[in-house]
Amino acid sequence: MAGLKLQAVTKSWDGKTQVIQPLTLDVADGEFIVMVGPSGCGKSTLLRMVAGLERVTSGDIWIDRKRVTEMEPKDRGIAIVFQNYALYPHMSVEENMAWGLKIRGMSKAHIEERVREAARILELDGLLKRRPRELSGGQRQRVAMGRAIVREPAVFLFDEPLSNLDAKLRVQMRLELQHLHRRLRTTSLYVTHDQVEAMTLAQRVMVMNKGVAEQIGTPVEVYEKPASRFVASFIGSPAMNLLDGVISASGDRFELPGGLALPIGAGYRGHAGRKMTLGIRPEHIALSSQAEGGVPLTVDTLEILGADNLAHGRWGDQKLVVRLAHQQRPAAGSTLWLHLPEHQRHLFDGETGQRV
C-alpha cells in the first residue's frame, strides 16, 4: 500500500486565473477519499493532475513517499477507471484485462495468474471469453476495474465510473466498490458529482467548489457540521434549509424578514447586528403546536415519497422544507406548527459563508 500527498497544488490554464486554488491533501495508506462537487468545480482536473494527464502549475504530488510531480503517468504507480469503459471491442474480457500487462512485457504465466485472480474477485470467471458487446453495463464496468486491478497499482483513481449506469446498477456497483476496497485496501481517490456515492463510499469526503476544498472530513462530519454555507447546501437530500437574517441587537435572537425571530442563546452577543444565515435540515425540524410556542408554516405543496413526505412552505420570501413521517400528509394551505431544535441549528457568516 502507499499514501498520496498533494502539497499546495494549483492549476491555471492562462497563468492568471487559478482553477485549482492552493490545495493540500494527505491520503493515508489504504484510505478511500471521495472528491465531490458540482460540474466545473475542479475535481476531475485535480484527479488528472494526480494521474499526470495534466501538468501541475505549482506545488507537489507525492505517491508512496516519492515525488511524482513531473513523472510520466506510466511511472507513477497509478491505475485509472474512467466514466467510459474504453474496452477494446474486438478483444475478449480476458484479453482486455491482460493487455496492459502484455505490452509491459510481463510473462504469460504471470499475466494469467493476475487476470484469473482479478476475475475471481470481480465475479467475472464465467465471462472471460466474451466480447464487450455481450456484456451488460455493470459487467463492462467490472472489466474496466479488473483491467486496473491486475496492474496492482499503488493508487486507484476513479473518474465518475458509475455515471453511465442506471440507478439500480449504480446502487449495486457502489456495494461492489465497497467490498472491493475492503478486500484490496488500495489507496483510492474517487471523483463524483453524486453526493450519495460520496457519502456511501468515502472514508473521508473532500467537498469542492470553484477550485477550493471547502471541507475535508468524514461523511458524518460534513453532514453534521458543515464548514460553510456551500457545504450545507450541497450535502444532504433535500438540501439544508438556509434562512437569511440578522442577529438581534441583544445578540440572543435570530431575526428574519417579516418580524419572525428565533431564540439562539447568549453565545452570539459578539455578533449583534451582523447578517447571518441560519441552517437547519428538513429532517431535524419537529412538529409542535401553537401552545408550545411553535412557529407557523403554511404548506404550499406536499411531496409524497413513500417512506416519508416533504412539506414545502415559505417564511416571507424564504423557502422552508420539512421532512414528515409517512402518515403525516398535511393538505396544501394548512398550517404546520414547527419546533427548530437549537442544537440542530447552524449559523453561517452572511458575508464569507463560513460556519460561525
UniProtKB/Swiss-Prot annotation:
<keyword id="KW-0472">Membrane</keyword>
<keyword id="KW-1003">Cell membrane</keyword>
<comment type="similarity">
    <text>Belongs to the ABC transporter superfamily. sn-glycerol-3-phosphate importer (TC 3.A.1.1.3) family.</text>
</comment>
<keyword id="KW-1278">Translocase</keyword>
<dbReference type="InterPro" id="IPR047641">
    <property type="entry name" value="ABC_transpr_MalK/UgpC-like"/>
</dbReference>
<dbReference type="InterPro" id="IPR012340">
    <property type="entry name" value="NA-bd_OB-fold"/>
</dbReference>
<dbReference type="Pfam" id="PF00005">
    <property type="entry name" value="ABC_tran"/>
</dbReference>
<dbReference type="GO" id="GO:0001407">
    <property type="term" value="P:glycerophosphodiester transmembrane transport"/>
</dbReference>
<dbReference type="InterPro" id="IPR008995">
    <property type="entry name" value="Mo/tungstate-bd_C_term_dom"/>
</dbReference>
<dbReference type="InterPro" id="IPR017871">
    <property type="entry name" value="ABC_transporter-like_CS"/>
</dbReference>
<dbReference type="InterPro" id="IPR003439">
    <property type="entry name" value="ABC_transporter-like_ATP-bd"/>
</dbReference>
<dbReference type="GO" id="GO:0016887">
    <property type="term" value="F:ATP hydrolysis activity"/>
</dbReference>
<dbReference type="GO" id="GO:0015430">
    <property type="term" value="F:ABC-type glycerol-3-phosphate transporter activity"/>
</dbReference>
<dbReference type="InterPro" id="IPR040582">
    <property type="entry name" value="OB_MalK-like"/>
</dbReference>
<dbReference type="InterPro" id="IPR003593">
    <property type="entry name" value="AAA+_ATPase"/>
</dbReference>
<dbReference type="GO" id="GO:0008643">
    <property type="term" value="P:carbohydrate transport"/>
</dbReference>
<dbReference type="Pfam" id="PF17912">
    <property type="entry name" value="OB_MalK"/>
</dbReference>
<dbReference type="GO" id="GO:0055052">
    <property type="term" value="C:ATP-binding cassette (ABC) transporter complex, substrate-binding subunit-containing"/>
</dbReference>
<keyword id="KW-0067">ATP-binding</keyword>
<dbReference type="InterPro" id="IPR015855">
    <property type="entry name" value="ABC_transpr_MalK-like"/>
</dbReference>
<comment type="subunit">
    <text>The complex is composed of two ATP-binding proteins (UgpC), two transmembrane proteins (UgpA and UgpE) and a solute-binding protein (UgpB).</text>
</comment>
<dbReference type="GO" id="GO:0005524">
    <property type="term" value="F:ATP binding"/>
</dbReference>
<comment type="function">
    <text>Part of the ABC transporter complex UgpBAEC involved in sn-glycerol-3-phosphate (G3P) import. Responsible for energy coupling to the transport system.</text>
</comment>
<keyword id="KW-0997">Cell inner membrane</keyword>
<feature type="binding site">
    <location>
        <begin position="37"/>
        <end position="44"/>
    </location>
    <ligand>
        <name>ATP</name>
    </ligand>
</feature>
<keyword id="KW-0813">Transport</keyword>
<feature type="domain" description="ABC transporter">
    <location>
        <begin position="4"/>
        <end position="235"/>
    </location>
</feature>
<keyword id="KW-0762">Sugar transport</keyword>
<protein>
    <recommendedName>
        <fullName>sn-glycerol-3-phosphate import ATP-binding protein UgpC</fullName>
        <ecNumber>7.6.2.10</ecNumber>
    </recommendedName>
</protein>
<dbReference type="InterPro" id="IPR027417">
    <property type="entry name" value="P-loop_NTPase"/>
</dbReference>
<keyword id="KW-0547">Nucleotide-binding</keyword>
